[in-house]
Amino acid sequence: MISTRIVRFHPSTMRRALLGAGLLLGSAGPLMAQADDSVLPQITVTDSADKKKLAEKVSSGALGDRSELETPFSTRAVKSDEIEDRQATSLAEVLKYDASVSNNSPVNGTHPATISVRGLRLDDLNGYKIDGLANINRGTEMPLEMFDQVEVLKGLSGFMYGFGSPGGIINYVTKRPTDDTFFATDLGYASGGTWKEHVDAGGRFGEDQRFGYRVNLVNESGDTEADHGSINRQSIGASFDARLTSDLTVRLDAIYQRRIATGGTDVIVSGFRIPSPLDGTTRLYSNGSFTDVDYRLVTLSADYRLSDDWKASVAVRHSESVRIYKKDQYYITSNSGNYRDRVTSEYHGYEFNEAQAMVQGKVRTGFLQHELVFGAMAQNLLSTSSVNTPKPYIGTGNLYAPTIYSADSVNYSGGTYRDEKTTQTALFASDTMKFDDRWSVLAGVRYTNYIDAAYSTANTTSARFTANRLSPTAAVMYKPRADTTVYVSYAEALEQSASAPTTTVNANQTFAPIKSKQAEVGVKTEHDGWNGSLALFRIERGSQYINSANVYVADGQSVYRGVEANGSLQLTRDLSLDGSVMVMGSEITHAAAAVNGKRAVGAADMQAGAQLSYRVAALPGLQLHAGAQYVGTMALDSANANMLSPYSLFDAGLNYRTRIGGHMTTWSANITNLANRKYWTYYQETYLNVGAPRTLNLNVRADF
């Protein structure tokens, strides 16, 4: 049963607790520094480009844990140190320099942390994982402070994770207990008036250091530069483990977050031209509007080493999220930016339960070395909604001189009801057959039983879809040398179809699952001082779009063809460059005449990103960084009547690491959207959001 109880932390109470250690350091640090100010501290900074990035492990679901170099699909991992250095505060900021990823969400609002990969928006309920297991992403900006890295698997993931968007999978990897005891605290500020306090502590204790812990606490509150909005967030993350024997480790992970935000109004354009972009600080939301999300997750897991070559794992997870919101949507009514303001008040609750067991190992049959994975998974998702969801128009205005109304009188009523239940059970197996040091073949299959039932307010079944499908994957890999992999891969998948948008005649109608196929050819290579990857892909996916009668339909097929390249280069001892580019064409085929041959919505024709990092040798500990992002044209609607203009964004920042009182202290500053560029971001067909304005983030961190 989804709980509607919301735990409330007072920001000032949590702030006092979190800042206690920081204030102690702040007062003691200068005194300690004065006692030894004749000796300059020795600072050693290791740039990420020095590391073998492609050799690091990424989670590959039913394929087990593999390095990026050994994975026959395109992948990307962003570690927590890079997230902290850039002061990234959202999933979109974490992944902005990966050209395959585009942002589909506002800074605030009811749908944060929504992204597309290869032009395909990820499924909020199946496309985002935590440690490879189910996660509720709808309406939730995950607390990045809780995670060691964020991984992107690009392309079809049906075999590896089950139902999901063919664009890919986002996987958050939680911070784990550390072998050495440590305590860190940091204080951050974002322009507009948002303050954040964060504590991170970890270590081990007990006989033979058998027990480990990692705890993160966050408090964030204040006004935001974007939308003239506000945020109030409290997050708690805890990870515990027990090494019960040399072969058996048991883990317990938990995350809680309460996040209240204002802003993030949707601008809906149909039948008129796209308005000129607005300044990102423009307030568009009414008095009384908000988004309140209460999120919690608990996972119990165990890993057991069966032998030197075999291991088993089992995990059970429960997560739930309650999202209550009152939001504005501006329906454009003229080519000069006039609009009607429609307010929706709604309750949404989600409850995920999942269990998974997996065995991985190696065997040899003759000249073949087999890397085997076997597993089973079961999960169910319950969704509840408000019985009466009012959506009145409360006024009119113009985007360039918006009128702020009151939405206090608009409130959902009648309690809540179960509106949908989705169940998946699956069996999966894969075999990576190594013929020699150069050639290997991967074959895998996943059998899924899928049931999706929608319900009316009278608790009767209004729609029901079932599927029993095999999701195969296959790949051939060739290693001309130990540091290079050339691969060809093929995969099929099913995804839960989108419901009809609320702006259509058949609002909220559900559809049968959609089938997708992907073929990919790529190469990955890693050397001292540089690494790179190149992939060519083709994705076929069943289409959903709004037709000329304003009815959302499932019809035809969307085809995506593209090439993406990524690389890192250590230009000098102190200067490094990361770059990424994707060029893609998309087309709707076998569909109604009005959309046949048109570009797929939300898929940019080109994207690029780059980061430059420079260590200042004259001042050890100082590192400068700059970034650039380009997003090309994309279609706002299936008929291609409106096309979003391309835009470029630039960022810059610095980090300075030094010792104060014997403790490493890091000072960080970062500015996003340096030129304060005005731009629109795509959310879904006909929906726009205002792009984020120039924002300054400051932070100081002390490690004990």
Predicted regions, residues:
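Structural signature of Gram-negative outer-membrane beta-barrels, strongest in the C-terminal barrel
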Residues: 241-243, 350, 369-373, 377-381, ...
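Gram-negative outer-membrane beta-barrel transporters
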Residues: 536-540, 554-638, 675-678, 701
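Surface-exposed extracellular loop regions of Gram-negative outer-membrane beta-barrel proteins
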Residues: 260-274, 380-385, 451, 464, ...
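Short acidic/polar hinge/loop motifs at secondary-structure boundaries
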Residues: 133-156, 173-174
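Extracytoplasmic beta-strand/coil segments of soluble accessory domains associated
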Residues: 54-68, 72-75, 80, 92-133, ...
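Conserved C-terminal beta-signal and adjacent last beta-strands/turns
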Residues: 6, 34, 372, 519, ...
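Membrane-embedded beta-barrel scaffold of Gram-negative outer-membrane proteins
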Residues: 301-317, 321-327, 486-487, 512-570, ...
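Outer-membrane beta-barrel translocator/receptor signature
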Residues: 145-148, 159-236, 244-248, 296, ...
